[in-house]
Regions:
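Transmembrane-helix signature of polytopic, membrane-embedded enzymes
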Residues: 110-122, 133, 138-161
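Short hydrophobic/aromatic helix or loop-helix immediately within or flanking a transmembrane segment
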Residues: 65-115
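Residue-level signature of the transmembrane alpha-helical core
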Residues: 9-13, 17, 96, 124-129, ...
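A structural signal for well-ordered alpha-helical segments within the folded catalytic domains
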Residues: 15, 72, 91-95, 99, ...
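Hydrophobic transmembrane alpha-helices and immediately adjacent juxtamembrane helices
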Residues: 61-67, 87, 124, 130
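Start-transfer (signal-anchor) and selected internal transmembrane alpha helices
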Residues: 1-55
């Protein structure tokens, strides 16, 4: 990895940690605008994985509440499958990847946090890894197009720290 590319990967990783910290701080200080995370009806068919531990703790509830807007639909599709017609708008790669990650690598967390919270963690990790990869490829593409590594670096920094980048990391 070339030194500027390694710097972009580090910068993108730091920006995701900063966004996560700011998101959690905002969750603690303010009431959420979108309350769709609290809507959690049971699956129409019985899920193949346990949905919640017997003692559902506040940590699991806080993690599950991080799935808002479209994240609610992605996590529901990962947990229950495609139950309703409107859920077909959310293509299966992300829900399938979330389910695979939560059933393999993060399976030991399911008895502690519950399946839904582990799905949300899996989705956040997948999206943040994809963001770091996108920042690296954005830098490489910018170098090819702009023919100036300094301008490509500045463009990548702006990509990592733009105000809308919170959406790149959320489920």
């Amino acid at each position: 990895m070339t030194p500027p590319l390694a710097a972009i990967v580090r910068l993108a990783t730091v920006s995701r940690a900063l966004i996560l910290a700011l998101s959690l701080l905002a969750r603690l200080l303010f009431r959420p605008y979108d309350t769709s995370a609290s809507l959690h009806p049971p699956c129409l068919s019985s899920p193949s994985f346990p949905s919640a531990p017997s003692s559902y703790n506040s940590t699991a509830a806080a993690i599950s509440s991080l799935a808002v807007w479209d994240g609610v639909h992605f996590s529901r599709s990962a947990e229950c499958g495609y139950e309703y017609e409107q859920s077909f708008a959310f293509l299966p790669l992300l829900p399938a990847s979330m389910a695979l990650l939560s059933r393999t690598l993060f399976a030991p967390l399911v008895p502690v946090l519950g399946y839904r919270a582990v799905l949300v963690i899996s989705g956040h990790i997948l999206n943040n890894v994809a963001f770091v990869a996108a920042a690296a490829y954005f830098y490489r593409l910018s170098v090819l197009i702009l023919k100036d590594s300094g301008a490509a670096y500045r463009a990548s920094v702006l990509f990592c720290f733009n105000p809308a980048s919170v959406f790149y990391s959320s489920l």
